[in-house]
């Protein structure tokens, strides 16, 4: 759709830089490098992260679309430089290499430059090598790497500011469980709890759940294995009517699910009570509507804030399930694509568990989808125009919900 908020990323894991591009963001949205850096640092959080996180820094440059801390309405480009690029200049060179040069031969025949011919089960390596005709899995894994999500988090920081300025809402996440840990079942956190969540080594909201998750990670680390888990994203204060029932692609739950499934290693998504709803009878599955002097309210939120593909005024609640990291330290069985012989998967440096970071990436994707939905609903070339359109809509909703002659208890 012309004029619709769009985002894309470019770059490889060990390339010179990652690029995040955001198009059709209104003018006047405040953006700072400090805020982007803060969100990128949150993405690196988590007990069980690998050694790479200790030196994987994010060198930021705002290339286009921002002037004096405000968006211009033109395409926004943010570059995240690779601080280790000097170690990869030959291996990831965009120029053709002179293989008569002994330095190039040495760089490309051993260590990180050696051809990777043993695809890792669970990764994009095998299908990617066949689909694109590669004899080196590096041509696949460099782009399929979850390092790419840093660019998505950067793009979403602009969208976060937009949602904050227009609706006054924030997006948060927390980890429900890791591996077979005891899942968190306590009170739903609010944005006021975000610092406490980020201070947790596993981004858990609850000490018992945290301790169970850490124990799982320690056991997996000792066994030379990896873990997945479940994260939850929560957004309070969304207006009624984002999304639409008109067609499948317009349904906000479909858009959110697609965005979350597009995150590396995410294998399942549920909105609200999700799969648990399938076990209930209809009389126990839906959120009844009531009205009092303070307005419409509900006693439950099983739908997770979405009905008929639209926000219904309740808290948005969505969960995503991440599979265990595919790069297993003890290496899984595979074949060598060079000769067809049995082999073990190549072992790239990786984490035991990246679920805490996945929560931050899930926040980013939900944020981008919500910002797009807000602009689809309210439009606006500038932040002030969008805010004015929202104010008018909310006043109309308020007027619509005034019922004349309603008797007490009716």
UniProtKB/Swiss-Prot annotation:
UniProt xrefs under Pfam families: Chorismate_synt (PF01264)
Cofactor binding note of this UniProt entry: Reduced FMN (FMNH(2)).
EC number, as in UniProt: 4.2.3.5
CDD domains cross-referenced by the UniProt entry: Chorismate_synthase
Keywords: Amino-acid biosynthesis, Aromatic amino acid biosynthesis, FAD, Flavoprotein, FMN, Lyase, NADP
Binding positions for NADP(+) per the UniProt entry: 43, 49
GO cellular component: cytosol
Protein's pathway: Metabolic intermediate biosynthesis; chorismate biosynthesis; chorismate from D-erythrose 4-phosphate and phosphoenolpyruvate: step 7/7
NCBIfam families recorded: aroC, PRK05382.1
Family: Belongs to the chorismate synthase family.
Protein's recorded name: Chorismate synthase
Taxonomic placement: Bacteria, Bacillati, Actinomycetota, Actinomycetes, Mycobacteriales
Gene: aroC
């Amino acid at each position: 759709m012309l004029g619709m908020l769009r985002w894309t990323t470019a770059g490889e894991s060990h390339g010179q830089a990652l690029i995040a591009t955001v198009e059709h963001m209104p003018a006047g949205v405040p953006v700072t490098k400090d805020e982007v850096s803060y969100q990128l640092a949150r993405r690196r959080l988590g007990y069980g992260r690998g050694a790479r996180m200790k030196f994987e820094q994010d060198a930021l440059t705002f290339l286009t679309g921002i002037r004096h801390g405000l968006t211009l309405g033109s395409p926004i480009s943010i570059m995240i430089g690779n601080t280790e690029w000097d170690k990869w200049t030959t291996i990831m060179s965009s120029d053709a290499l002179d293989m008569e040069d002994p330095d190039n031969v040495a760089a490309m025949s051993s260590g990180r430059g050696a051809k990777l011919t043993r695809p890792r089960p669970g990764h994009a390596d095998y299908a990617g090598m066949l689909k694109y005709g590669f004899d080196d899995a590096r041509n696949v894994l460099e782009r399929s790497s979850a390092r790419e999500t840093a660019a998505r988090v950067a793009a979403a920081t602009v969208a976060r500011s937009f949602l904050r300025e227009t609706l006054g809402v924030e997006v948060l996440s927390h980890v429900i469980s890791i591996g077979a840990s005891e899942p968190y079942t306590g009170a739903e956190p609010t944005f006021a709890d975000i610092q406490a969540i980020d201070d947790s080594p596993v981004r858990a909201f609850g000490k018992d759940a945290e301790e169970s998750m850490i124990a799982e990670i320690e056991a997996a680390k000792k066994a030379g294995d990896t873990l997945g888990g479940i994260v939850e994203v929560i957004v309070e204060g969304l207006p009624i009517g984002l999304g639409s029932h008109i067609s499948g692609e317009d349904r906000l739950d479909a858009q959110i699910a697609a965005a979350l499934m597009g995150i590396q290693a995410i294998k399942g998504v549920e909105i609200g009570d999700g799969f648990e709803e399938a076990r209930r009878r209809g009389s126990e599955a839906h959120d009844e509507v009531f009205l009092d002097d303070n307005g419409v309210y509900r006693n439950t939120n099983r739908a997770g804030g979405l009905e008929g593909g639209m926000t219904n005024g309740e808290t948005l609640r969505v969960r995503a399930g991440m599979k265990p990291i595919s790069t297993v330290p003890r290496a899984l069985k595979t074949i060598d694509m060079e000769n067809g012989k049995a082999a073990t998967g190549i072992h790239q440096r990786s984490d035991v568990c990246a679920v805490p970071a996945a929560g931050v990436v899930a926040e980013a994707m939900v944020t981008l989808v919500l910002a797009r939905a807000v602009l689809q609903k309210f439009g606006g070339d500038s932040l002030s125009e969008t805010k004015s359109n929202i104010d008018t809509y909310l006043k109309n909703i308020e007027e619509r919900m005034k019922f004349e002659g309603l008797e007490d208890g009716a």
